[in-house]
Amino acid sequence: MTPRLFALIPCAGTGSRSGSAVPKQYRTLAGRALLHYTLAAFDACSEFAQTLVVLAPDDSHFDARRFAGLRFAVRRCGGGSRQASVLNGLLELAEFGATDHDWVLVHDAARPGITPELIRTLVATLKDDPVGGIVALPVADTLKRVPAGGDAIARTESRDALWQAQTPQMFRIGMLREAILRAQREGHDLTDEASAIEWAGHTPRVVQGSLRNFKVTYPEDFALAEAILARSTNAS
């Protein structure tokens, strides 16, 4: 049986670094909620069986009317960390017929620059891989190490062979669930899915990502994301 594809969008964060009273995934960019662009990219990939959005149980900002016409489901099962939200979402996917052998693509809600083309490139590259992998970019900037709380450079780090992880991150549902459970049992709260897979002893692959697929994190990121999205909307 051919493994099916599922998308999981953890959307339970508060976006405290963005400087906004409203969680950043609901901020309006180029006329739409930031989250809308992520959902629209996966909606355009009809090969996906389901896209599941994981919200915080007490999320009062989500309004389904802002995403009318897009195909997705919502579960209010977000946890206290990204790792917990993803794990809870993986467990909920069983309700939609997902099996351990099926693929899940976990994507940050705050990466509105994702495109159907990049999603399909990732799937095409990894669909026969025994582990899975992520989209990422080779590090282009010079890296400086600065002690915590300080402002003086301790040393320059080599950027050779370093890649900056992005999302989506694509793994078998069962493998990812067990990897996160193992990390959780051993007291680790990991910041992406590939870290859990690595912790379990597997070797994920990297697929070339895109500069436009950056994560909206700081206040100045919104203007850049809006310019990119407005240009894409006008071009279409």
From Swiss-Prot:
<dbReference type="InterPro" id="IPR050088">
    <property type="entry name" value="IspD/TarI_cytidylyltransf_bact"/>
</dbReference>
<comment type="function">
    <text>Catalyzes the formation of 4-diphosphocytidyl-2-C-methyl-D-erythritol from CTP and 2-C-methyl-D-erythritol 4-phosphate (MEP).</text>
</comment>
<feature type="site" description="Transition state stabilizer">
    <location>
        <position position="17"/>
    </location>
</feature>
<feature type="site" description="Transition state stabilizer">
    <location>
        <position position="24"/>
    </location>
</feature>
<keyword id="KW-0548">Nucleotidyltransferase</keyword>
<feature type="site" description="Positions MEP for the nucleophilic attack">
    <location>
        <position position="215"/>
    </location>
</feature>
<keyword id="KW-0414">Isoprene biosynthesis</keyword>
<dbReference type="InterPro" id="IPR034683">
    <property type="entry name" value="IspD/TarI"/>
</dbReference>
<dbReference type="InterPro" id="IPR018294">
    <property type="entry name" value="ISPD_synthase_CS"/>
</dbReference>
<dbReference type="GO" id="GO:0019288">
    <property type="term" value="P:isopentenyl diphosphate biosynthetic process, methylerythritol 4-phosphate pathway"/>
</dbReference>
<dbReference type="InterPro" id="IPR001228">
    <property type="entry name" value="IspD"/>
</dbReference>
<dbReference type="Pfam" id="PF01128">
    <property type="entry name" value="IspD"/>
</dbReference>
<feature type="site" description="Positions MEP for the nucleophilic attack">
    <location>
        <position position="159"/>
    </location>
</feature>
<comment type="pathway">
    <text>Isoprenoid biosynthesis; isopentenyl diphosphate biosynthesis via DXP pathway; isopentenyl diphosphate from 1-deoxy-D-xylulose 5-phosphate: step 2/6.</text>
</comment>
<keyword id="KW-0808">Transferase</keyword>
<dbReference type="GO" id="GO:0050518">
    <property type="term" value="F:2-C-methyl-D-erythritol 4-phosphate cytidylyltransferase activity"/>
</dbReference>
<comment type="similarity">
    <text>Belongs to the IspD/TarI cytidylyltransferase family. IspD subfamily.</text>
</comment>
<dbReference type="InterPro" id="IPR029044">
    <property type="entry name" value="Nucleotide-diphossugar_trans"/>
</dbReference>
<protein>
    <recommendedName>
        <fullName>2-C-methyl-D-erythritol 4-phosphate cytidylyltransferase</fullName>
        <ecNumber>2.7.7.60</ecNumber>
    </recommendedName>
</protein>
